[in-house]
């Protein structure tokens, strides 16, 4: 392991002299993690309401903007992971990303504080003139979002591995520390989501947007201060090269040698370096075209230690099998990523449903903020995970004999099924909400929308809880799947692939919203997705998404049947144990 020197750290390349401070630096890392998540989530969790109420955007426009913002943030993780692994290392990447995130939070707050940076407030009367944002206002808002995208994209793939770097993976104490750190990481993430979706959203919706957006900026500043306060104590692993280089090299060499005749597995070049720590993989029959990159010809010269003189002319069978692992995962990744196409609808249009529902709690005047309804999704996930881990897994283990009760792909498949159920429930509830709004006395008018249905907003909770449970199965299941099926040196890349799936779903959601709106606008009954949901047919849109998810489930079952799990021949013992600790991220 190569680390940067700190005041008390010693020479590079001397792993025995690295000072792992473990829990001594966790107050800095976990403290930063808590404030950073509060800052990022607090700035973006209520964004769709902010865009419709302060920037006077139409609901469908705001939903598209939020989808593009979320998609870009998630796709940015793969760029950040590449730069982190290839050039800067985790500490420098995190440092830059956190500063960018803080500046983005400040800029977002300024759009609310400074009146020229947002359009004039619209009158509440239906049909009144409502001016949208100017180009200058949009540009400033976009600049704030770009900074937040840079921050989120850099923090997500680096935070978890950086915390694990502080523990010695070769000691019992270190391995236990890594396991506990993952538990605390999940706890702080959930805690931040809950606080942001309740307290911060309440302040933004009921007190002041200026104060509500200033809170995340202040929290981000505190996170930066805490993180940099422990700077001299951290173990800082240097960049060691991106796995993307290895993937590219295998594919390029295979193309160069495409005219060679296939050979048997025993004839393939299979040099393994003495310091190699990945799981050693056996030969597989899938994608045999790539095997040609491991066929040694007379032109392929070797060094004295057996390594190739030119790595762009000859690859080892191990390198080929690692690339096969990545390629095998991609069809599964596509299906698992589409799960979030439905998930995103629950975090956008459910908010619009709640705005035209009775959000009162009991006989009092207190109303649940529309942006806080997604907290029930988080509650469903948070409550189900320990039940799954402590009750369902031991029960299933008795019948399957598997440590996890079921395979990772079976877990994802169960989540996809519940996702379909959630969308069907959403459609049925929307039918009822709209019927009540059109046939029974209403509770007034929602600004720039329409009549507020007397249906209780509590009816929206089941669809959110179902989606939360689906995420606990499909979302966490696919994260576990990527971590276990990718080679050990590609685990940062695996984490970024998970976020890229969410990003892909965000972009697809934007396209789907545009296609449905533009297509149905010409129908005699009008658009399915108008500003006033009582005049639309949102339930048809939900049924459409449920149908798409049904087709996706069929595709998932097909590729899951085709998939072959990673074939591990032997492992370096220390690395094997470290891998087990890293897998804890999924629980």
Swiss-Prot record:
Disruption phenotype: Decreased nitrate content in root phloem exudates. Enhanced root-to shoot nitrate transport and plant growth under high nitrate conditions. One of its GO terms (cellular component) is plasma membrane. This is Protein NRT1/ PTR FAMILY 2.9. InterPro entries: MFS_trans_sf (IPR036259), POT_fam (IPR000109). It is found in: Cell membrane. One of its GO terms (biological process) is phloem transport. Expressed in roots, stems and major veins of the leaves. Detected in the companion cells of the root phloem. GO terms for molecular function: nitrate transmembrane transporter activity. Belongs to the major facilitator superfamily. Proton-dependent oligopeptide transporter (POT/PTR) (TC 2.A.17) family. Keywords: Cell membrane, Membrane, Transmembrane, Transmembrane helix, Transport. It comes from the Eukaryota. It comes from Arabidopsis thaliana. Low-affinity nitrate transporter facilitating nitrate loading into root phloem. Not involved in dipeptides transport, but has a weak glucosinolate transport activity.
């Amino acid at each position: 392991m190569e680390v940067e020197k700190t005041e008390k750290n010693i020479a590079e390349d001397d792993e025995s002299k690295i000072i792992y401070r473990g829990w001594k630096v966790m107050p800095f890392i976990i403290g930063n993690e808590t404030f950073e998540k509060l800052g990022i989530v607090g700035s973006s969790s209520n964004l769709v309401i902010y865009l419709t109420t302060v920037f006077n955007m139409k609901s469908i426009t705001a939903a598209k903007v939020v989808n593009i913002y979320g998609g870009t943030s998630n796709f940015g993780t793969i760029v950040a992971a590449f730069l982190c692994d290839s050039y800067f290392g985790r500490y420098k990447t995190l440092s830059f990303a956190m500063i960018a995130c803080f500046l983005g939070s400040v800029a977002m707050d300024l759009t609310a504080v400074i009146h020229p940076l947002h359009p004039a407030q619209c009158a509440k009367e239906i049909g009144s003139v409502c001016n949208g944002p100017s180009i200058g206002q949009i540009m400033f808002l976009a600049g704030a979002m770009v900074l937040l995208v840079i921050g989120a994209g850099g923090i997500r793939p680096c935070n978890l591995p950086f915390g694990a770097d502080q523990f010695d993976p070769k000691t019992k104490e270190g391995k236990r520390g890594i396991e506990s750190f993952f538990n605390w990481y999940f706890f702080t993430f959930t805690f931040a989501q809950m606080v942001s979706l309740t307290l911060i959203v309440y302040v933004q919706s009921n007190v002041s947007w200026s104060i509500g957006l200033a809170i995340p900026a202040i929290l981000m500043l505190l996170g930066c201060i805490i993180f940099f306060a422990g700077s001299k104590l951290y173990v800082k692993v240097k960049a060691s090269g991106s796995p993307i280089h290895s993937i590219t090299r295998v594919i390029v060499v295979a193309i160069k040698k495409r005219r060679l005749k296939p050979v048997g597995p025993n004839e393939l070049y299979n040099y393994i370096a003495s310091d190699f720590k990945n799981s050693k993989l056996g030969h597989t029959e899938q994608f045999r075209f790539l095997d040609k990159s491991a066929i040694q010809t007379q032109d392929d010269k070797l060094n004295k230690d057996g390594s190739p003189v030119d790595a762009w002319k000859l690859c080892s069978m191990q390198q080929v099998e690692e690339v096969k692992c990545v390629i095998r995962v991609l069809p599964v990744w596509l299906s698992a990523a589409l799960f979030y196409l439905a998930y995103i609808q629950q975090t956008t249009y459910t908010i619009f449903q709640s705005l035209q529902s009775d959000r009162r709690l009991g006989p009092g005047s207190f109303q649940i903020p529309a942006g806080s309804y997604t907290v029930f999704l988080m509650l469903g996930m948070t409550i189900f995970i320990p039940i799954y881990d402590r009750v369902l897994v031991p029960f299933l283990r008795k019948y399957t004999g598997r440590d996890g009760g079921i395979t990772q792909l079976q877990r994802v498949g169960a989540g996809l099924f519940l996702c379909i159920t959630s969308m069907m429930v959403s459609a049925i509830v929307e039918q009822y909400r709209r019927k009540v709004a059109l046939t029974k006395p209403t509770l007034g008018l929602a600004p720039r929308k329409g009549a507020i249905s007397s249906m209780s907003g509590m009816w929206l909770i089941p669809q959110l809880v179902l989606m939360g449970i689906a995420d606990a199965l499909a979302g966490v299941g696919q994260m576990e799947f990527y971590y276990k099926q990718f080679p050990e040196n590609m685990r940062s890349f695996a984490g970024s692939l998970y976020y890229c799936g969410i990003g892909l779903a965000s972009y697809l959601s934007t396209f789907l919203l545009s296609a449905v709106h533009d297509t149905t606008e010409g129908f005699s009954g009008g658009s399915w997705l108008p500003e006033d949901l009582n005049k639309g047919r949102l339930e048809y849109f939900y049924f459409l998404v449920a149908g798409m998810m049904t087709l996706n489930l069929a595709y998932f079952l097909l590729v899951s049947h085709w998939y072959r799990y990673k074939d591990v021949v032997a492992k370096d013992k220390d690395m094997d144990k470290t891998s087990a600790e890293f897998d804890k991220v999924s629980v």
